[in-house]
């Protein structure tokens, strides 16, 4: 199988989403797997903090450090030069505030050559998302089941099962959209094709299954 001829650009990605075309993102942590994905039609790779559980054998993602994300993202970038690479921002690399978030995002982009970053959280991290985007770094939001706050959520449980929880997710998505987030990763929620979500054509949704 031949490699992709070129990497999808951020403007091309936005155009595809605006036209309703699907985009595929696969989670990868190392050079060999990145090489395989680069030879596939998949447009994006996520270097997730889940590497703590999948690669390191940890019980949670929170111990993963910014340096470890950078290390793995750098390896993935070498293996997938023609695929858009997303670097996950690990626990406590952005929670302090917008300036810390910008510094962490900048390190991921500068030191690993990733194309954009992903952040967990909704309206509470929207100011940090806006700060990073203003600096020229694309950001993907992540709401629903967020592993970094799983303890506060009562464990790895489906979110948005009640009308109140669903409304909170919609508010989170709106806040990220207003902060100019590239798209939103909606993980493990209790509703599918919710009319409130599907009617918001300006929202960039990416459904990720557990």
Residue ranges and their predicted role:
Residues 2-209:
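Alpha/beta enzyme core
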């Amino acid at each position: 199988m031949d490699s992709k001829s070129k990497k999808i650009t951020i403007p091309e990605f936005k155009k595809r989403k605006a036209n309703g075309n699907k985009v595929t993102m696969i989670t990868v942590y190392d050079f060999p797997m990145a090489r395989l994905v680069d030879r596939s039609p998949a447009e994006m790779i996520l270097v997730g903090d889940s590497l703590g559980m999948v690669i390191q054998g940890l019980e949670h993602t929170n111990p993963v450090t910014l340096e470890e994300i950078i290390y793995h993202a750098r390896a993935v970038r070498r293996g997938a030069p023609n695929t858009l690479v997303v670097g996950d921002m690990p626990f406590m690399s952005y929670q302090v505030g917008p300036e810390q978030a910008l510094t962490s995002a900048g390190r991921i982009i500068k030191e690993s050559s990733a194309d954009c970053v992903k952040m967990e959280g909704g309206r509470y991290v929207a100011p940090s998302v806006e700060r990073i985007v203003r600096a020229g770094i694309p950001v993907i939001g992540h709401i629903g089941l967020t592993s970094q706050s799983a303890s506060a959520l009562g464990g790895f449980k489906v979110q948005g099962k009640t009308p109140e929880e669903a409304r909170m997710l919609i508010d989170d998505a709106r806040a990220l959209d207003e902060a100019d987030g590239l798209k939103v990763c909606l993980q493990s929620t209790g509703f599918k094709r919710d009319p409130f979500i599907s009617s918001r054509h300006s929202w960039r949704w990416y459904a990720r299954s557990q």
